[in-house]
Amino acid sequence: MEKYFFSKNYKETKSAGNKAKTDIEEILLTNGYKNVGIRSNYKGSLMGFIATLLSLLKACLSIQPNSVLVLQYPLKKYYTFLCRIAHLRNCEVITIIHDLGSFRRKRLTIEQEVSRLNQSDYIIAHNDAMKVWLQEHGVTSKLYSLGIFDYLSKSTPQPNTNKDQYRVLYAGALNPKKNPFLKQIGAIIKSYKFNLYGSGFEAQNKFNDVINYKGFVPSDKLISAAEGDFGLVWDGDSISSCSGELGKYLKFNNPHKTSLYIRCHLPIIIWSKAALAPFIKE
């Protein structure tokens, strides 16, 4: 029995979502899985589209009967196509979920997403909360919980020698829609410093000298030189709870920044109602 996974064009590999996907591909390769797609990094939409189509063609020609195919979800319209090709050849499909479109971007209804996912034989959800949510909304595939994403890096965290104020580190995509709470947090910081890493933060959002915007730093460099004593996992429009659609998503989602913080050897501050809160406490 052959073991496969499908790779495609990634416009960039520095984002949390694509880093998680490429890490999983590396892990699958080391465990004897073969790539039936073509991994590429074209930034242009046209070249990226052509590269992904070539990946699909290669997959159609490469998948052997009675094999196993691992897909990383979401995969847009290609997901259903690949599931059907695999099942026509009596293959089993294992789906690793990275994001749920019906939650985050609202591009799919819950019914549409459940219908897609039910084309997989096995599904690996982020955690038990996501697993239960999928079951309650009609997913009939066999479900398993990941626990937490791996974070591959050759970098080594340096010993923390900070003896001054505690420093809270927040890393990720910084934009008003995803983390509007950042506009409020500067006003309440009294006894610690707040270091922001990522792109999209406007200079005028700096409220006082305790907020230090570091800009975008590649993850390998951040791991070896993180300026923080704690890593913050938070989304939404409030500093008292993770409210709003993206904030509520933390009840089911495993933010990849959590894995990054662990890789940086940072203790984690997280919303008590987040799906990962029990894992952090444990």
What annotation goes with each model-predicted range?
Residues M1-I94, W271-L276:
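N-terminal pre-catalytic "stem/leader" segment of glycosyltransferase-like enzymes
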Residues Y151-S224:
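Conserved catalytic-core segment of nucleotide-activated headgroup transferases in glycan assembly
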Residues A51, L100-S115, L152, L250:
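Nucleotide-sugar donor phosphate/pyrophosphate-binding loop at the beta->alpha transition
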Residues I223-R263, I270-P278:
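Nucleotide-sugar-dependent
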Residues L46-T52, H87, C91, V139-Y144, ...:
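Active-site regions of enzymes building and remodeling cell-envelope glycoconjugates
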Residues N35-I38, Y122-A125, S145, V168-A171, ...:
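Short, hydrophobic beta-strand segments that form beta-sheet elements in well-ordered domains
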Residues R105-L108, Q119-L143, A274, P278:
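A short, active-site helix/loop in glycosyltransferases that binds the activated sugar's phosphate group
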Residues F6-K11, L71-K76, L100, H126-D128, ...:
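Structural motif
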